[in-house]
């Protein structure tokens, strides 16, 4: 991983470093015989290649558009330059751009976990240098506007065509420098972001490669532990089931034996009761005969007395004799 980041930093240093080119004396001192109107009316060439996507790029695009409007040197621009409004607006846009660049850098640096600290410090230093160059260019624009404002105020009532021509030329150069350093910073941040993404992907891949065998081992070990833990439990359950089954069978056999004993005892009791009943019946028959012998004479005597009584009653009332009651046997 360290070798990868080292190669990435070398490529960044070799391919993206761009020093600010000093302006030539010829560009600093334009010949006064240049045609002022031609310089003022020359259209600003479009900046192909600049693509705004990140917040800092959008902020820089607003700075760029405002600077292009200032370069037109229209009457409104002249009024706002003299009132210091242009300088204030450029300062606001510049600070906003620097703030967005700083926030974007901080966001990328938070994602640099896999990068070595030495490599991270080197890359951060290069980004800081590119950011400083862009800030210097933007401050040069603001300084040049302040100088132009002072020169215009000093030449009130005089022709400022030559002054405006020089200012327009300087603004074109400054805009080119801003564009060049902005593109340089954009490339460095793109390489920085690509390195962060690649490092994160490699880290995830490395973690997956390292963790997958460990996960497989853990899964296999867990399966073995489950098997070992389940086997004794199953054997224990089977043993308990057999013990319970044996006890139930033993209790059932005991219950059946007890029922058989109870049944035998009941049969014995029943037999004894029948025997006793027969004995009592046999013993009662002589007693019954004896009682019958005792009461039959009394009954016959009572029947005779009843018949005599009835005859007397009939004779007294003069009715036919009534048949005496007959004992039903």
Curated annotation (Swiss-Prot):
One GO molecular function term?
A: heparin binding
Please give the biological process terms from Gene Ontology that the record holds.
Answer: acylglycerol homeostasis; cholesterol efflux; cholesterol metabolic process; lipoprotein metabolic process; melanosome organization; phospholipid efflux
Give the region (Homooligomerization) as residue ranges.
278-329
* List of residues that carry Phosphoserine: 159
Q: Where is this region: LDL and other lipoprotein receptors binding?
A: 170-180
- Tell me the residues on which Methionine sulfoxide occurs: 155
The free-text function statement in the UniProt record for this protein reads:
APOE is an apolipoprotein, a protein associating with lipid particles, that mainly functions in lipoprotein-mediated lipid transport between organs via the plasma and interstitial fluids. APOE is a core component of plasma lipoproteins and is involved in their production, conversion and clearance. Apolipoproteins are amphipathic molecules that interact both with lipids of the lipoprotein particle core and the aqueous environment of the plasma.
Q: What is this protein called?
A: Apolipoprotein E
Q: Which organism is it from?
A: Arctocephalus gazella (Antarctic fur seal)
């Amino acid at each position: 991983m360290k070798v990868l980041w080292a190669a990435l930093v070398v490529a960044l240093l070799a391919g993206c470093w761009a020093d600010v080119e000093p302006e030539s004396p010829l560009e600093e001192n334009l010949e006064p015989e240049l045609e002022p109107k031609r310089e003022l009316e020359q259209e600003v060439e479009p900046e192909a290649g600049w693509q705004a996507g990140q917040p800092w790029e959008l902020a820089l695009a607003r700075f760029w558009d405002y600077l292009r409007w200032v370069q037109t040197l229209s009457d409104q621009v002249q009024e706002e330059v003299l009132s210091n409004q242009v300088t204030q607006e450029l300062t606001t846009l510049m600070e906003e751009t620097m703030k967005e660049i700083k926030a974007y850098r901080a966001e990328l640096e938070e994602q640099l976990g896999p990068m070595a600290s030495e490599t991270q410090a080197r890359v951060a230093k290069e980004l800081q240098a590119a950011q400083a160059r862009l800030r210097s260019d933007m401050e040069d624009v603001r300084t040049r506007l302040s100088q132009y404002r002072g020169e215009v105020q000093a030449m009130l009532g005089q022709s400022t065509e030559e002054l405006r021509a020089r200012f327009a030329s300087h603004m074109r150069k400054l805009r080119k420098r801003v564009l060049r350093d902005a593109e340089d910073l954009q490339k460095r941040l793109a390489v920085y972001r690509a390195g962060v993404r690649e490092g994160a992907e490699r880290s995830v891949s490395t973690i997956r490669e390292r963790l997958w065998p460990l996960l497989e081992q853990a899964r296999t070990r867990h399966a073995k532990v489950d098997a070992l833990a389940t086997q004794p439990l199953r054997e224990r359950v089977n043993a308990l089931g057999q013990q319970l089954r044996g006890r139930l069978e033993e209790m059932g056999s005991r219950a059946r034996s007890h029922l058989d004993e109870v049944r035998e005892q009941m049969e014995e009791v029943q037999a004894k009761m029948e025997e006793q009943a027969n004995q009592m019946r046999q013993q009662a028959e002589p007693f019954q005969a004896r009682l019958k012998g005792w009461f039959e004479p009394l009954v016959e005597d009572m029947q005779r007395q009843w018949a005599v009584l009835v005859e007397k009653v009939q004779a007294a009332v003069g009715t036919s004799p009534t048949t005496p009651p007959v004992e039903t046997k």
